[in-house]
Structure formats: C-alpha cells, structure tokens
C-alpha cells in the first residue's frame, strides 16, 4: 500500500481502482432543512430533540457541545429534517464548506437540521465517513463550493439539485475502510494531544 505524496485530485489513493459517480448515485435520500417559519424562537424548550447549528458542523463529525431543543412532537412534525446516526449534514447557507457525519457513537438517536442545512443518507457504495473526508480535501471543497453565491449571505445555489450532480471518485469499500481507519487514528491522536495541552495549561 503506497502512501507517497499525491496531488489534491489524487488524495487518499492507495494504488487501487477508483470509479467516478455523481452524488445522486451514492445516496439513498436527500432532504432540506425546514423553512424558518417552521422553527420560531418560541418553539425552543429546555430539553428535547437537539436542533443543529453551525457550531455543530465544525470538523469531520458532529460536535455536540451546544444545542437548542424542540419537543419530540415538533421534531415529529419536521420528519424530513430529522437526521440520524450515519447521516451526513451539509451547510448550504452561511458558513459554506461545512460537512459532517453523525457517528454511531452520537449521544442522541436523532437531531433536527436547521434551515441553513441539508442532509443526505449514503447508500452501500460509499461510507459516510469517507464521503465527508473527501469533501474536506481541497478538491472536495472546490467541488462543494463551485455553485456558491457571494451576493448577500453566502449560499449554495439550488443546493439539493446541484449537490447531486457533483461527480466524485471513490475506491472500493475495503480501501474506503482503510482510509477511514487511518484518518480516524490521526484524529484520535490529535484529540489526545489537545486534551493533554489543555490539562497542562490549566
């Protein structure tokens, strides 16, 4: 297995065959967040189902450091905006370029995405972790932001349709698993070092 330096386009290649797919062929489901009028300020409660915001989409996987909540009944009424473990969440308005997956170790069974986000459910061709890692590479970010408008609040034009037309190269599942394991190991080391530094500074 070769890990020699590659170009941005060849990120993650392990000397394996890659196939190119439009995202529409890699997902089973895509859904936009609710209209703003469907989640007003008076909808929020002290406990319930978490509603995601931009601070939850920093890094590769969902951050659970800060939430606002709606009742289970309200979340039920926003069924298409409910995101579950294994789903991928993308920002389409505001801080563009954000994309995370919800890990199987997530604290909650479900979440509600905001009006500035959309979610996808990957099919069996691609691991959600690999899918997200790809879009954190320079070439992935370029493709993700290719339909961005900078007039007013930054936003992706027609996000659900344009996103599905993006073509990406993916290897076989076994290679995806190797990449995910490698990057996961690096993330763990980085997190551990950060915790050590925080303890030393305390």
Give a label for each model feature.
Residues 16, 110-118, 149-180:
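A short glycine-rich beta-alpha junction/loop motif
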Residues 20-41, 55-88:
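Sequence-specific dsDNA recognition surfaces
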Residues 21, 129, 133, 137-138, ...:
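Residues on a specific face of well-ordered alpha-helices
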Residues 26, 52-55, 123, 171:
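Structured loops at beta-to-helix junctions and adjacent beta-edge loops in soluble globular domains
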Residues 53-54, 72-140, 152:
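A short beta-sheet element
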Residues 136, 145-146, 169:
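Well-ordered mid-protein domain cores that form the structural environment of catalytic cofactors
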């Amino acid at each position: 297995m070769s890990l020699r330096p590659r170009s941005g386009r060849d990120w993650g290649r392990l000397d394996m065959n890659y196939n190119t797919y439009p995202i529409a062929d890699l997902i089973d489901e895509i859904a936009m967040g609710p209209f703003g009028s469907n989640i007003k300020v008076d909808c929020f409660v002290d406990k319930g189902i978490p509603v995601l915001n931009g601070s939850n989409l920093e890094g590769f996987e969902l951050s659970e450091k800060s939430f606002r909540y709606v009742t289970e009944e309200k979340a039920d009424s926003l069924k298409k905006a409910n995101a579950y473990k294994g789903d991928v969440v993308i920002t389409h308005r505001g801080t563009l370029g954000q994309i995370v997956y919800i890990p199987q170790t997530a604290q909650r069974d479900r979440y509600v995405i905001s009006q500035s986000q959309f979610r996808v459910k990957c099919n069996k061709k691609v691991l959600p972790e690999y899918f997200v890692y790809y879009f954190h590479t320079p070439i992935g970010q370029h493709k993700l932001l290719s339909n961005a408008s900078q007039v007013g609040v930054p936003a992706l034009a027609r996000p659900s349709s344009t996103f599905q037309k993006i073509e990406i190269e993916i290897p076989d599942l076994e290679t995806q698993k190797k990449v995910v394991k490698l990057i996961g190991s690096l993330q763990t080391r980085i997190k551990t070092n950060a915790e050590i530094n925080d303890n030393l500074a305390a």
